[in-house]
Amino acid sequence: IIDVVEMPTMTEGKKNKKQVNGSQIFNEISVRIKKFDKKDIRVIIEQVSAMPGQGVTSMFNFGQSFGILKGICSAMQLPMYFVRPAKWKKYFNLINSEKDASRTRAIEIFPYFSSELSRKKDSNKADAILIARFYHETYKMND
């Protein structure tokens, strides 16, 4: 894990809805990978799907964000690996736990990221860290 950052977003439309900022994602990835050989890079993405009770608009926006990330990585010719939420959560004993439990677990494993995970709303970044760790510990051996 070379870094952890917030997903870049931008506001759009009259209602100032936030959406993923694709060009900024490209920039963030480009800056972080330029010193690495592409054969040594892995992009690990959570393989998510629609959730029960999620509205149509939310579902569409969620899928659009997922597609933007896949499209950027494809265009950059970066290898992508997908991990289902149940797999990585089971691995870290986080099934049926509070959302904040992943933040606590990530800090236990990577104390040097504690300043990046100090707020409750940083649980999404903690999830990303744990997904990367899960891949590294389970799938990387098969590469």
Can you name each region flagged by the protein language model?
Residues 1-143:
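Phosphate- and other anionic-substrate recognition elements at nucleic-acid/protein interfaces
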